[in-house]
Amino acid sequence: MSELSATERTRHRRLREKGRTDRAALYEVLRAGFICHLGVISGGVPMVVPTVYGFDADNLYVHGSAASRSLTGREPSRSRNGSEADTGTDARQDAPGGSEAETSAAMGTVCVTVTHVDGLVLARSVFEHGVNYRSAMVYGVPRKLEGEEKLTALRILTEHSAPGQWDYARQPSRKELAATTILAISLAEASVKMSSGPPDDGEGPDAALGLWAGVLPIATTWLAPIPDPLLPEGLTPPDHIGVRAGTRLS
């Protein structure tokens, strides 16, 4: 497995011992979740948007509406009084998102983060309190996908969070595809940090205080599926959904 290339943006400067430079660590963080935070500049204003993602060996794929400013870099339409115009849900969804080149030029470099909190580190002193975590940060100029490449990325996105669902559910229609934007962001420039273990004050002067210290773990677990109340009687979840109940997400 290759190493991550260090750049001015991804070089570990603080807490270097927590930094990981192997690409396997990046994939580990990305596999463990399906929600990322996409940071963009829109109209000179920073925006951080939560969205679903998927990935392959080379790219991170993020999903959203074709009318979303965060996924197109377009300025919002304005009414005569200067406020953002509400053009109606259907009109926004059918609005064109611009070409691949236009989207890349409008958005410039973006930053995507994925973070998993594994526990609270409760130390003897408040100063030493902390968090056990796994975190990845990806920089890149997004590329808007079209055609078969877009459909392939949608499958990757769907299968990442819900394995088996792409083949089980109805495939997207042309109108649905037109209303959806998929961006590809290269994984070439990425940074990973991980922190685990107990507090750092177990051998210092605070150890004599007689206070409890340790880690309060956190885990995200899939619960039993909740059926749509409009389902026909007797229709049960398919195996690829039901089998996940009681399992950990990450």
Model regions and ranges:
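C-terminal edge-of-domain segments
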Residues: M1-T10, G147-S250
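Short, surface-exposed beta-edge/turn micro-motifs
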Residues: G33-C36, M107-V110, T180-I182
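Short helix-to-loop capping/linker segments positioned immediately adjacent to catalytic or ligand/cofactor-binding
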Residues: H37-V40, R124-S125, P142-L145, W166-S173
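A structural signal for short, well-ordered beta-strand segments
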Residues: Y53, G140-P142, L187
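Structural motif
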Residues: N59, T109, S135, V141, ...
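A generic structural motif
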Residues: L60-G64, L183-A184
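Short, structured beta-strand-loop surface elements
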Residues: A66-T87, D94-I156
